[in-house]
Amino acid sequence: MALWGWRGVGRRPTFFVFASLAPIGRDFLRRNGDDARMMGHLEKLLAPTLDAMGYEVVRVTLLGSQNPTLQVMAERLDGVAMTVSDCETISRALGALLDVEDPIAGRYSLEISSPGIDRPLTRPKDYARFAGHEARIETDRLIEGHRRMKGLLLGIDEDRTVRLRLIEGKAAEDGTLPEVEIPFGAIVKAKLLLTDALIAKALKDAEALADEGEAAGGAVEGGVA
């Protein structure tokens, strides 16, 4: 087993990589079946461990087949920014779990990352959390004549319909841009666009968490005194 670690700067995510030295087996996809189904299985397998540690799965992705890399994107439940130390902690815990469960045939690497500012949108709650920010969405079918759309997120309805105001395209006579409704299940890929507003939100959230931490520390010190 080998470990590597490095930290990104600014918008770039933080990574920590764990490499398993298991012998190379048959082609991963042929042995384990459908990629999407396998990722769903792995997410369900990993989620309880992460939750118990104070983290949450954002996305599980597989790259490659002969020597696959399993990428696990995670975030802290308390909202604090991920660090290399967090990624290392997750890597060791999930590495041990995967060694026991052995869901992957052959040699593989486990890569842990944080979402970054211009993060992927993978869960229904992400569309509510980042309403008011711009995103790029790709679907598996035509939606209002589009499969790739860029627009302002307006939120998500109870029936899991994502609402998006397009920022590209022909405006109506009153100057408003068209709005589209996208079934969550039709979304293949979605990601926030890096904008000044998104960066400002990230900085504001970080400052708020820092203030909360200082306030909590002051309260504890006052209680001890």
Swiss-Prot record:
Record carries keyword DNA-binding: no
The entry's keywords: Cytoplasm, Ribosome biogenesis
GO cellular component: cytosol
SUPFAM superfamilies the UniProt entry points to: YhbC-like, C-terminal domain, YhbC-like, N-terminal domain
Subcellular location, record wording: Cytoplasm
CDD domains: YlxS_C (cd01734)
Gene3D superfamilies: RimP-like superfamily, N-terminal
Any Pfam family the entry gives: DUF150_C
GO annotation (BP), single: ribosomal small subunit assembly
Transmembrane segments: none
HAMAP family listed in its UniProt record: RimP
Stated role: Required for maturation of 30S ribosomal subunits.
Similarity comment: Belongs to the RimP family.
Record-given protein name: Ribosome maturation factor RimP
Organism ancestry: Bacteria, Pseudomonadati, Pseudomonadota, Alphaproteobacteria, Rhodospirillales
Gene: rimP
